[in-house]
Amino acid sequence: MSETLSNIVSKNMTNDKNSLESMNISSSSSAEENPKKQAKKXKERGPDPSANPFHLSGDVDFFLLRDQERNKALSERQQQKTMRVHEKMTYSSKVLAKHTSLRRQLQLEDKQEDLEARTEADHLRAFRDYNTWKLTLTKEKNVEPENMSGYLKQKRQMFLLQYTLDCKRREIQRLETLATKEEARLQQAEKSLAKDAALFDEFLRENDCSSVQAMKAAEKETKAKIEKILEIRDLTTQIVNIKSEISRFEDTLQHYKVYKDFLYKLSPKEWLEEQEKKHLFLKNAKEISEASKDGSVNSTPGDKGPGIKGKASSVWAKEGQGTKKPWRFLRLGRSLSYLSSPQQGSQPSESSGGNSRGSNSPIPLTQEDTDSDGEEPQLYFTEPQQLLDVFRELEEQNLSLIQNRQEMEETLEELSRTLKHTQIRMDREVNQLKQWVSTMMMSITKEEDTAAELELKARVFHFGEYKGDQQDKLLESLNWKVLDVYRNCIGTQQEANLGTVQMLTIIEHQLDELLENLERVPQVKIEQAERAKEKERRIRLREEKLQMQKILQEERLQRARARAQAEIKKKRGRTLVCRSQPPVHRIKQESEHTLMDKEKEELLFFFT
């Protein structure tokens, strides 16, 4: 019995041990899983200030969340106002960014869940391996009996585990009650939101009604405004039409005034003087009548003389006033008849044009004076034929003047043409004479040079025939010339009171050296030097020619000035001219000094 009891107790202990181990493993696994879940909840809900992990966070307040979202939207709106264009984001880009962030978070959560599932599978696999290993080890082995202390220890552990389970159940119940309370609170908040939505809908309805009324009132006001604008437009068109008619009438009035001035200018002076006298007489009579009227008003009833004068003046004034209005109507009728029938408006236009303007007329009779005097203004031309006669006379005068002017122009053109031809001929002759003078001067200078050379040669050939003084002078001049050549060719460094012959020998040696060097110089450099010398010679000749031309121009100007200042000699009668003789045929003679001229040119070319 004892053996059986011990076997049973040992079996129970082993079972209890296995159960305890399984509970420990499950508790350990649950303990490992709980921190992960708590960490996950803490990640989802945020940090909890209290130490109790089963306490609800403050983020559950939906009203607070709504306020936070509203403040966040306001801050984002203010930030959008301050941001630049390239820094702003559209709604689609924001939504895409949110979607990408949510997708990334979901991917991370999926990865974490996969890792957790893998770890749990690894734990289960290890536990299964451990149980199988334990069964294989304990199989067919005698299990040693355990003592009471181990058994009590196991029971204590079981009790503690049961206690923890009860605590967790109570905490779960408490959390469920809190969840029900929060759900009730949320339902109440939903009801308040529904009430707020109903109030907001009512406000929107009232706002729509007020906006409809405002739109109707605005439409009425716009209709009234459009009607007023149309009325104003009609009135403005009428004003513009009236102004255009006024301007048209003013233009016609100006035309008539121009015609009137023209007719007054064509009228004779005697008639104008008569009209001026008549106007002055009427003006004086009017002044006398006004003065007599004033005297009759101020006089007593017994005074008959002044009263009679006042009556006469009043009758005169009435007649003037009576003739004033008909004249105005007559003028208007004439203008209308001129506008209606232009083909019959020659005489009426003349009369109305002559009567429409008097301010710019050459006589003192004006339109205001005629209106004030009450009499119709008169014109000298009563028939168109009179005006045509005046036109014919003026046309004849103009034709005669035009003919005289044409004759004068023809004579002037002939004179200018002859003057031009004579000027051209004189200029040509002057240029020819100048060329002849220049050629003669050049030939004279050449002849003088050749004569001087011949004279020098003759003196040299006839050296013994001259006297000693002349020879000394000639030798001295020759010495000076040789010295000048020596200084120009060799310089003043080697000059030490040399004689003429010595200087000539030195010049000859220098010339030989130069000729030898010249033979050694390449042909290209010689050609360049020749070109340079030729260019200098041409420039010098051009300058001399320009100087000669300037001198000739000055002489010509002096002669012209003297000719202009001299007295004009009037030729009387024909000039005596001798008979013309046939021209003499001159034979051209070749100059004997061409060789000498060539030598001079070579000397000038190479030694200047």
Curated annotation (Swiss-Prot):
Disordered as annotated region, ranges: 1-57, 291-320, 339-377
Primary location recorded for the protein, binned into one broad class: cytoplasm
Keywords: Cell projection, Cilium, Coiled coil, Cytoplasm, Cytoskeleton
Pfam family name, one: DUF4200
Biased composition (Polar residues): 1-17
Low complexity bias: start-end ranges: 20-32, 339-361
Record-given protein name: Cilia- and flagella-associated protein 100
Lineage: Eukaryota, Metazoa, Chordata, Craniata, Vertebrata
Gene responsible for this protein: CFAP100
